[in-house]
Amino acid sequence: SEMCIRDSFIAGRIEAAIDTYLKNLLPPMFKALAKFSQVHEYSWHTPGHTGGTAFMKAPAGRAYFDFFGENLFRSDLSISVGELGSLLDHSGPIGASEKYAAKVFGAHRTYHVTNGSSTSNRVIFMACVTHNQVALCDRNCHKSIEQAMTMSGAIPNYMMPLRNFYGIIGPIPPQALQAEAIKKTISENSLITKDIDSTPVHAIVTNSTYDGLCYNARRVEELLGQSVDRMHFDEAWYGYARFNPIYKDRFAMYGNPADHKPTDMTVFATQSTHKLLAALSQASFIHIREGKKNVDHSRFNESFMMQASTSPNYPIIASNDITAAMMDGKGGKALTDESIHEAVAFRQLMAKLNADFADQGEWFFNCWQPDFVKDAEGKKIAFRLANPEYLATEPECWVLHPNEAWHGFGDIEDGYCMLDPIKVSITTPGIGPDGLGKMGVPASILSAYLTANGIIPEKTTDFT
C-alpha cells in the first residue's frame, strides 16, 4: 500500500506538471479565444454568419464552411464579446496580449494592427505629424508613408539612399543624416517656405531594405537625434531581428527597454508579422520606446482608432499573439538560427557552382554577397570556402566594408550597414561594377523559368 501511495503521489505530480505546462503554453488572447469558442451559446451579435451556421444553409456556403473548418467561424467574433476585451480600448485578453508582445519584442508599448503595416505607418504619422510640419523621409519609403504624409499634411524632406550597379537601393549614407546635411536639404526644399517652421518633428527610415540591408540603429539615432526627437523605423520585413545576436543593435527595439531614457529619442517600429513571422495576412505590430516628445497612449490611440475597424478579425489578432509566443524565450533564436543556416548553405552552394562553371569557362548564377570574408583568425578566404557556422554567427561576415566591389556603395562607413543573410538576391550575368557585359541574362527570364517550375520569386529586377 505504501508503494501505491507513492505511485499515486508521483502520478499526481506528473499530472500537475502537465496542467501547469498547458496553462502556460498559450499566450493570453489566443487562450481566451480558444476557451470562448468552446462555449456553445446562441449568438445575438455580429458577425451574421453566427459561428458559421449561416453557411450551412446553401451548398456553396457548406463548401466554404467545410474548406476552412468550424473553429475559424467559431472564433470570428464581435467586439460585443466582453470576455475577450477590445482592440480599440486595449482591454481584457487583447490588452494583455499587447503587453505580452511588448515584453517579447522589447517595447514599452505594443499595438496589434489587423490591416497591415501600411495602416501601422499611417497610425504613427497621424499621431505625430500635422499640417505643414516637416518630416525627414527615406526616399526608399513604402507608399503608405507617402499616403500618411498626404493625409496628415506633412511636408516631406527626403533623405536620398545610395544605389549600386545592379540597381539595388542601398542605405542612406551617414553623412546625409548629419545635422548640417539635414539643414542644407531643408533650405533647398521648395515646399518649405519662410512662413513654415522648418524644424523636423519626425524621421522615417526603412530598415531593413527590401534587399536586406540593415542599418546600425544606434548610429542612425545618434545622427538623426541631432535634428529630430522622434524616430520611426519601417521594419515591415524585419520583425525577427531581436531574436538573433547576429542582428545586434541593427533594429529599432535594440537592447533592454529599461535602459531607454526619457532623454533618448522616442522610437517607433512597424513590423509585418505576416511577412516573415508566423502570423496571418494583414497582421502587424506597432512597437514604441518612449522618450523625447513622447506621444502618450490616449493621444496615440485616437489615431489608432481612426485607422482601425470596429469589427477586427480575431483570428488575425490571435496569430499575432501566437507569433509572439513562438519567438519568446529560446524559440526565437532556434527559429532564426534555422533560417540563417539554410540561407548560408544555399548561398555557399550558389557561390561554389558559380566558381566551378567559371573554371570551365562557362557562366552560372550567383548571389549578391561578399566574395571574400575574414575567418576567425583574420585570414581572407573565399565566401564559398568559409566555415558555415562562422558565417551563420559572425556579423562581420555580412557588414558592408568600405570600397568592397561586391556591394557597389563605395566608401561607406564601416559597420554602418549589414546584409541580412536570410535575404537572398540571385544575380544573373550581364552587369558589373564597370557596366554592361558582353553577354547577359535578364533576371526576368530566370524568374519566368522558376515560376513555371512552381518557385515564385519575391521580387525581380533587371539582373537580380
Where are these regions (language model features)?
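Short, small-residue-biased leader/transition segments that mark boundaries at the very start
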Residues: 2-5
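Short acidic/polar alpha-helix capping motifs at helix-coil junctions
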Residues: 60-66, 109-112, 185
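Conserved PLP-enzyme active-site core in the AAT-like
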Residues: 119-355
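General small-molecule cofactor/ligand-binding pocket signal
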Residues: 111, 157-159, 458
